[in-house]
């Protein structure tokens, strides 16, 4: 029996590699987003800690220098939190972009796999037709051989 050789197998292989790369890039983007969100959470936690310290200082004694230091720290945390929110947004956009590339790569791979399946089905039909033709020829040959030998 003839062996099936898909003429565009190298393209399918490339599409598989591109999909793997897109999947890796998506995973990296998700990891980066998670890291950025953790950083933002730590900043928010530090800010909350400073705010608790400030409320304790305000209710206890009036240490103006310490109060100003903590208020300044809260402002710095607000600034850092805002910057980190921007980083989180960038990371979210990168995740979305990577998701779209992965989706596109998966669609392209599936298209080429369908083409390969259709080519394989055509190949099987051709082989079947060829085998049927050979059987018909063999039967026809045997019939004509028998008919010819009976006439003698």
What role is predicted for each listed range?
Residues 1-152:
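Charge-rich amphipathic alpha-helical interaction elements
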